[in-house]
Amino acid sequence: MNFRIFDKIGNSYKKSLQNRPVITKSLTGTVVFFLGDTLAQKIENRGYDPKRTLMMCTVGTFIVVPQIHFWFKFLDKTFTKPGWAGAIPKVVVDQLTFGPYLFVCNMTSVQLFHQGFNFDTHQWKDKMKKDFFPVLQKAWMIWPLTNCILFRFVHPDYRILISNLVSVGWNCILSTVSNKSFLKNNNNNNDPSISTMASLNE
């Protein structure tokens, strides 16, 4: 088996990261959000909705991943100590500030896609009250350890790539939680046009 092709792919990816870091990471995120939402819909077994996958990919590509890129750069500039002395503060600050913010950002973006100018603020508040802390607890079971490894051992250029691999499963969870209330609404209206996920907590 010729492994040179993998070397070429790796070198091309590295060069792309150096020349177009945000675009490269965002496109990688597109693949991750595609896999996460497709897996979520497969598990739900309600039929595949490509519009929802497109929506989640759009949120990931243009909203989530670019913010993570600049957030990681901010952490690297703010906490400059080597080893664990720099990694631990990054993880703590990330999990207490940016992690919760990013979840709210994701949920809000999905609701905007579903409702547009008819955005229901009461539904948004109810959703935050119901889902915010349960999802945050799930996040804290995954991301503190993951980010400890990222900030301690992984080169900054490749952190989002490694994070994206973990995110396939995590985005499956996010896709489920972000879309679940719209599934209930569509079921009540007997509208099969939007296939969404049932609650993880039910």
Swiss-Prot record:
The lineage of its organism: Eukaryota, Amoebozoa, Evosea, Eumycetozoa, Dictyostelia. Coiled coil: none annotated. Pfam families: Mpv17_PMP22 (PF04117). Belongs to the peroxisomal membrane protein PXMP2/4 family. One of its GO terms (cellular component) is cytoplasm. It comes from Dictyostelium discoideum. This is PXMP2/4 family protein 1. The chain crosses the membrane at residues 21-41, 54-72, 138-154, 161-177. PANTHER family: PEROXISOMAL MEMBRANE PROTEIN 2, PXMP2 MPV17, PROTEIN MPV17. Its main location: membrane.
